[in-house]
């Protein structure tokens, strides 16, 4: 049985603009897509973050939804997959832990943002070929959280 492990860490900033700025503001628009394993989407009109996952059977499921994703702030996001459980961290808090997850196995292309999407920024995105420790997640967050943008 094929298994793989990975982690992705990055920072996302969403500017505050009115929903009529462009059509992307009225729909879920991709901010950071790790080959749909998962995809971070934001809807400005609803002020809602949704994290979607495409599974091995090519179905999509919602891993996490919140209307507490801070606009006009840098938000640290981490996807940590150990081969059996997918954990999602936002600003050093575990917000979702989904056991038995088998992401869709495909060549993965990571994309940041969407053409004519939501205004903001993405920085300090790192891919790890193994799951990372809780201590490393905390360090990735605390080491640059006071910087604007949060880069070394």
Descriptions of predicted regions:
Residues 1-152:
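Extracellular glycan-associated modules
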């Amino acid at each position: 049985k094929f298994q793989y492990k990975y982690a992705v860490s990055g920072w996302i900033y969403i500017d505050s603009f009115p929903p009529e700025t462009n059509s992307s503001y009225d729909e879920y628009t991709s901010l950071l897509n790790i080959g749909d394993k998962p995809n971070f989407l934001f809807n400005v009109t609803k002020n809602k973050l949704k994290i979607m996952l495409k599974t091995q059977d090519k179905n999509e499921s919602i891993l996490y939804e919140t209307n507490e994703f801070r606009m006009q702030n840098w938000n640290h996001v981490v996807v940590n997959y150990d081969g059996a459980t997918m954990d999602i961290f936002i600003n050093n808090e575990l917000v979702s832990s989904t056991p038995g997850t088998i992401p869709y196995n495909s060549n993965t292309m990571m994309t940041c943002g969407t053409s004519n999407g939501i205004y903001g920024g993405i920085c300090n995105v790192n891919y790890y070929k193994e799951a990372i420790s809780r201590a490393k997640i905390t360090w990735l967050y605390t080491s640059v959280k006071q910087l604007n943008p949060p880069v070394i």
